[in-house]
Amino acid sequence: MMKAIRSFSILLSLWFAAFACAQTSADPVDVYIHSEMQREHIPGLSLLVAREGRIVRAQGYGLANVELQVPVKPETIFQSGSVGKQFTATAVMMLVEEGKVKLDDSIKHYIKGAPAAWDQVTIRELLSHTAGFGDYPKNFNFRKDYTESDLLKIVEDIPLAYPPGTRWSYANLGYLTLGILIHQVTGKFYGDFLKERIFQPLGMSTTRIISEADIIPNRATGYRLVQGQLKNQEWVSPTLNTTADGALYFSVLDLAKWDAALYTEQVLKRASLDQMWSVTKLSNGEPNSGHYGFGWEIETRDGYRVIGHGGSWQGFRTHISRYVDDKLTVVVFANLESAETGRLTDHVAKMYLDAH
């Protein structure tokens, strides 16, 4: 392993040196990415730039697997982290359009036996992280296997952090619960619903629920830095790679298909998409402090309107930013849990925006 890590460091240094020497003629995006990969010790990275749903650049950098010296390609598959939440939110909005779910209904209408404390918790609040749900408890065992009922019981036993609708607080357990809602409303496991209703119709052939047991061509390995040393990701139980808070595989090529579909009504009606991309309001009428819609963050950066989301899971960091008015989308995936993919995404976007 140490030999592989040394080889990786040498290889990345050689790449950077080559680009530094030829900086006057090299592509400035390549120069920037290689420089940042060296600075952050990122093994591998995948980049997508798209305009109006058409690919401008889909490129891999570095290594998908350090030990086997496998390079990243546009086809390389990374784990989604919380970028997967936008697919959960889309699935819920599909059910809303079909009249099977109402945004302002209590979650108790859809999840049998939910506690009395959830009486006032609405689907809208779960989608926007304003329901009072929290994150996994500190003593949660990520290496234990759970049934869906086990996970729901854990969530139900955690008191609400605040009255629903009064505050914003990012809540993975809220999205986990939405995945269970999808299952109970449709009779289909969350991942199967996404495959049938989103991934297959859009031709997202490599996007699926995580399974470390299955043979997955082009799958990247996730890494972490421990006291400056590159280490493999820590493993979690198979159950926790199937939850709706962000447990997908995908490539930047599949995200390009997703991005293109968002310019159409192929997945959802325009009114539903606009609702997802609008900052929700608290019960006092004020916008939530997280600038959050349904599965998307909505921000203004340097005068540009941006909808996006980041993710982190099992040695991977991901980010998607869609510059709405400029019809520019930038996606960065990295196989290092500490990679600053959001910052990289913004910088690459600025390079393209400044060039036009």
Language-model region placement:
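Bacterial N-terminal signal peptides that target proteins for export
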Residues: M1-I10
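Bacterial N-terminal signal peptides
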Residues: S9-A18
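Catalytic loop of the DD-peptidase/beta-lactamase superfamily, centered on the K-T-G motif
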Residues: Q23-Q59, H183-E196, Q200, V226-H356
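N-terminal, post-signal-peptide region of Sec/Tat-exported proteins
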Residues: H41-G81, Q86, G99
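Active-site helix/loop module of the DD-peptidase/beta-lactamase fold
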Residues: G44, P74, Q79-V83, L95-K138, ...
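Short glycine/proline-rich turn/loop motifs
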Residues: L68-V72, E156-A161, Q233-N241
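Second-shell loop/turn segments in exported
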Residues: I77-Q79, Y110-A114, P137-F142, P163-R167, ...
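Catalytic nucleophile serine of serine hydrolases
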Residues: S82-V83, S169-N172
